[in-house]
Design a protein with these regions (language model features):
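N-terminal twin-arginine translocation
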Residues: 14-19, 30-44
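Metallocofactor- and cofactor-centric catalytic cores in central/energy metabolism, strongly enriched
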Residues: 44-158, 210-236, 259-325
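N-terminal secretory signal peptides
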Residues: 1-16
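Flexible loop/turn segments at secondary-structure boundaries
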Residues: 62-64, 102-105, 129-132, 152-153, ...
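Conserved, well-structured core segments that form the ligand-binding/active-site neighborhood
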Residues: 23-24, 161-381
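Anaerobic metallocofactor- and corrinoid-dependent redox/one-carbon enzyme cores
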Residues: 47-52, 56, 70-81, 101, ...
């Protein structure tokens, strides 16, 4: 764990992180990296200032491996901008900045703070799964938990859900792309400084968040003539369906899927899929690669060889589906690729299957695949979009993100939308899809929990096909 401490006080002090301000001097605008000062300069600050420990939860300053946002991502300028926003927006606060990768790193920081007069903590989830906020919350000090969007969002939402279920009293939440929202939440630490409780702090942050979240915009949607199967025919279609799982590692809910949804599930070894890939017709693969090159709006950092290998993987998926009389396949993609079990990413193959009214699903996510089977049957061919959600309260948006998506969202016979072929985002390898989704339509998000006999359901109006290089390639923002 690399620990850096940066005090925010006088903007001109050379040992402090520089400000990134339009009104600042040119020399100050150039500093992007964290600077370790090695001491706490108490004398430089007024004793009555509210002192906040800022902990960035991340793997490293420059990301070493495949994860959100992406391999090679440089967090240093991001952290510098956050520090600058805090300094500018909260001049009556003192910020002491550190980084932590593990709970043990966080605990060392906490132990060192025992005599440092820290009034509260701001934990910024920069990567998804670094469990840093948990030991911080255990201090019972007021803790503001913030999400670096498209970087820490997965862990942030999962951990936040647990904190809400546990009714943790000392946590405030920020999930906003607007730094002013962060500043407003940080100012709530003064509630405790002035004698309030941690519960008062948490309540104040909630009020601020709600007050800064904009109200609904025009929610009128484009017309969409959706014709659904009746219940009897939909259930019959589900019973005719079969899901193939390759490299299954998700929690075993297969018995519940079979019992409650009537969908058959069958395991397939990597070796069978890889053999079909090796045996795929090279001429057909070349034809498919030609079509992709012709139809894609953009192809970036993906070679012709990779396109042909991806086309062969699509043909392999089709062959295995045909051989086993199935209409859905879900693959533990990265586990197979990095384990040497498969040698081409299946993303473009999934894209093609979904365009055809079949189901290709990422990560051997059998729960989402079963949901897709049911809803594709019910909507008579409309594809699902497995997604990892991101919240942006400043825009009143939820952003759905993944590296596989159809570009025929209204079904195989419906209108198509533009798509781009890019690398798989987290590791910048292989080939995947950015679907430039249509906007103005009502979207419905579902997840079936057959083992609990529950369905999660919400709706939102599609308002933006987000183009951001971080995290998964296809992104759709809904309000």
């Amino acid at each position: 764990m690399k620990r850096f401490e940066t005090l925010s006080g006088c903007a001109c002090c050379p040992v402090h992180r520089r400000r990134f301000l339009a009104t600042g001097c040119a020399a100050c605008a150039g500093a992007a990296s964290l600077v370790g000062v090695g001491r706490l300069a108490h004398a430089a600050e007024k004793p009555d200032k509210t002192r906040i420990r800022v902990i960035y939860a991340l793997h490293a300053e420059v990301q070493p491996g495949a994860d959100w946002p992406n391999v090679g991502f440089d967090f240093r300028p991001v952290m510098a901008r956050i520090d600058a926003a805090l300094k500018q927006g909260c001049p009556d606060f003192e910020f002491v900045t550190s980084m932590a990768k593990t709970p043990q790193d966080a605990q060392k920081i906490i132990d060192g703070d025992q005599s440092a007069g820290v009034d509260g903590y701001l934990v910024y989830q920069m990567n998804c799964w670094n469990r840093v906020v948990q030991p911080v919350l255990a201090t019972n000090k007021p803790t503001l938990y913030a999400d670096f969007q498209y970087g820490g969002s997965g862990g942030y939402l999962v951990y936040t859900a647990g904190f809400l279920r546990d009714k943790r009293p000392n946590i405030g939440l920020v999930a906003s792309s607007n730094p002013d929202d962060l500043v407003a939440a940080v100012k709530c630490f003064d509630v405790v400084k002035k004698g309030g409780t941690v519960e008062d702090f948490a309540a104040a942050t909630a009020r601020v968040r709600k007050s800064l979240t904009p109200g609904p915009s025009n929610m009128a949607c484009e017309p969409d003539r959706l014709e659904l199967l009746d219940v009897k025919d939909c259930l019959a279609a589900m019973k005719r369906a079969k899901i193939l799982t390759v490299g299954r590692t998700f929690p075993d809910i297969v018995p519940a899927i079979v019992k409650e949804m009537g969908i058959e599930v069958e395991d397939v070894p990597y070796a069978e899929l890889n053999a079909a890939w090796e045996a795929a017709d090279k001429d057909k693969a070349n034809e498919i690669a030609d079509r992709w090159q012709k139809m894609a709006k953009t192809i970036e950092d993906v070679s012709r060889k990779t396109l042909e290998e991806s086309a062969a993987m699509y043909l392999a998926q089709k062959e295995v589906l045909k051989k086993r009389n199935a209409n859905a396949i879900t693959i533990n993609c990265l586990g197979g690729f990095y384990g040497g079990h498969i040698h081409a990413y299946p993303c473009l193959g999934f894209h093609e299957l979904c365009n055809e009214g079949l189901i290709g699903a990422c990560e051997c996510d059998v729960r989402s695949t079963a949901t897709m089977v049911a809803v594709t049957a019910m909507t008579q061919g409309r594809p699902g979009f497995i997604s990892d959600p991101v919240i942006d309260t400043s825009k009143r948006q939820i952003i759905y993100a993944h590296c596989v998506a159809s570009n025929r969202v209204f079904g195989p016979e419906g209108a198509s939308n533009p798509f781009e072929i890019l690398t798989h985002s987290e590791d910048r390898k292989g080939a995947s899809v950015r679907s430039v989704f249509p906007v103005g339509h009502m979207t419905t998000t579902l997840e079936f929990g057959p083992e609990r006999k529950e369905i999660l359901f919400h709706q939102g109006k599609a308002v933006e096909a987000v183009d951001d290089d971080r995290a998964c390639r296809s992104k759709l923002a809904a309000e």
